UniProtKB/Swiss-Prot annotation:
Protein name: AP2-like ethylene-responsive transcription factor At2g41710
Disordered, as annotated region: 1-28
PANTHER family in alphabetical order: AP2-LIKE ETHYLENE-RESPONSIVE TRANSCRIPTION FACTOR (PTHR32467), AP2-LIKE ETHYLENE-RESPONSIVE TRANSCRIPTION FACTOR SMOS1 (PTHR32467:SF32)
UniProtKB keywords: Activator, DNA-binding, Ethylene signaling pathway, Nucleus, Transcription, Transcription regulation
GO biological process entries: ethylene-activated signaling pathway
């Protein structure tokens, strides 16, 4: 306390002695305050004992929040806490972002080392043994031989199945390449109805799920499954046993079905492509024998042809065809008759009589005989033709008038108030 009081009295005495030194004392007080703040921050940092990166590295592996990893190409998800492996492919063009390169997602893993090894295998497949990876290349000698015969997509799909026995725990952004495989790479045949389900079979770490799905497609001979529950048309002469039958009889039926399928598969030639066995369908020789033994068997087409609806349809079609044929015959006969008439008789042109109303009573009629036009065509056209009154020119009308008619008659035109025209002869 004495030291504090003595230090406090020092500035006061200096301030009192120096009358004009108030500005210098305020600067020293501000500097001392900054020094105290710096010492407090430094002391708090020493008490923490480590930086932010060191504290993140000391976090337990089960807690989420650590996003970095010590391995190349591996990050930790912020919320799930799983390790995700990514690969940056620079050889492709990203159309969505319009730039070169895209990120290849290799899956999410519970183990950090498994994610790192998945990245190593993908990098070796993309860029070869000379690329930078997390572990030595000698650890992947066997994998380098296997990846030579696979494409990039196929090898990336195989990484999620058995990468060193550590499969991916989650792959929500990918789909299976083979039919019948889900995201967990379990082969199933759920489309086939029945009490039993094929996906109840458990697989080992080294089993190939895709080939197992192909084996299921060949009726799964070694699985002891009663196929008669799925195939209703199993056989023509086989009687289905009730569900209350004993287990021994069911096993016997399964074995019989298996032996029948095996015999059908062995009869096929090795050079021919594989075909599914036609269960319940007879071969060519058996079909002929059955036709000989049962000649009265009728097909679906024969039954349909004997139905009344089919017969009525046939009658309608026949009636329509007959009516069309009759119409065609009548038209042909008419054409023949018309052609004969045209060839036997000369075509006579009708003579049209033209008349002009003259006062409603008298009319100037023309004879019905045809007048030749030779005199009109050969005569010179030296006339006083008027477009308003063409009747005033006698030369134009001379060839058309009969020999007994007078040429001095004139016709006058009068216009009425109703805008109708009437022609009146000149009074004599």
């Amino acid at each position: 306390m004495a030291s504090v009081s003595s230090s406090d009295q020092g500035p006061k005495t200096e301030a009192g002695c120096s009358g004009g030194g108030g500005g210098e004392s305020s600067e020293t007080v501000a500097a001392s305050d900054q020094m105290l703040l710096y010492r407090g921050f430094k002391k708090a940092k020493k008490e923490r004992g480590c930086t932010a990166k060191e504290r993140i590295s000391k976090m337990p592996p089960c807690t989420a929040g650590k996003r970095s990893s010590i391995y190349r190409g591996v990050t930790r998800h912020r919320w799930t806490g799983r390790y995700e492996a990514h690969l940056w492919d620079k050889s492709t063009w990203n159309q969505n972002q319009n730039k070169k390169g895209k990120q290849v997602y290799l899956g999410a893993y519970d183990d950090e080392e498994a994610a790192a090894r998945a990245y190593d295998l993908a990098a070796l497949k993309y860029w070869g043994p000379g690329t930078l990876i997390n572990f030595p290349v000698t650890d992947y000698t066997r994998d380098l031989e296997e990846m030579q015969n696979l494409s990039r997509e196929e090898y990336l799909a195989s990484l999620r199945r058995y990468p060193f026995g550590r499969k991916s725990s989650g792959f929500s952004r990918g789909i299976a390449k083979y039919r019948g495989l889900q995201s967990r790479w379990d082969a199933s045949a759920s489309r086939m109805p029945g009490p039993e389900y094929f996906s109840n079979i458990h697989y080992g770490a080294g089993d190939d799920r895709g080939t197992e799905g192909d084996f299921l497609g060949s009726f799964c001979l070694e699985r002891k499954i009663d196929l008669t529950g799925y195939i209703k048309w199993w056989g023509a002469n086989k009687n289905r046993q009730p569900e209350s039958s004993s287990k021994a009889s069911e096993d016997a039926n399964v074995e019989d079905a298996g032996t029948e399928l095996k015999t059908l598969e062995h009869t096929s030639h090795a050079t021919e492509p594989y075909k599914a066995p036609n269960l319940g369908v007879l071969c060519g020789t058996q079909r002929k024998e059955k036709e000989i033994s049962s000649p009265s068997s009728s097909s679906a087409l024969s039954i349909l042809s004997q139905s009344p609806a089919f017969k009525s349809l046939e009658e309608k079609v026949l009636k329509i065809q007959e009516s069309c044929n009759n119409e065609n015959d009548e038209n042909a006969n008419r054409n023949i008759i018309n052609m004969e008439k045209n060839n036997g008789k000369a075509i006579e042109k009708p003579v049209v009589s033209h008349g002009v109303a003259l006062g409603g009573a008298a009319a100037l009629s023309l004879q019905k005989s045809m007048y030749p036009l030779t005199s009109l065509l050969t005569a010179p056209l030296l006339t006083n033709y008027n477009t308003l009154d063409p009747l005033a020119d006698p030369i134009l009308w001379t060839p058309f008038l009969p020999s007994g008619s007078s040429l001095t008659s004139e016709v006058t035109k009068t216009e009425t108030s109703c805008s109708t025209y009437s022609y009146l002869p000149q009074e004599k």
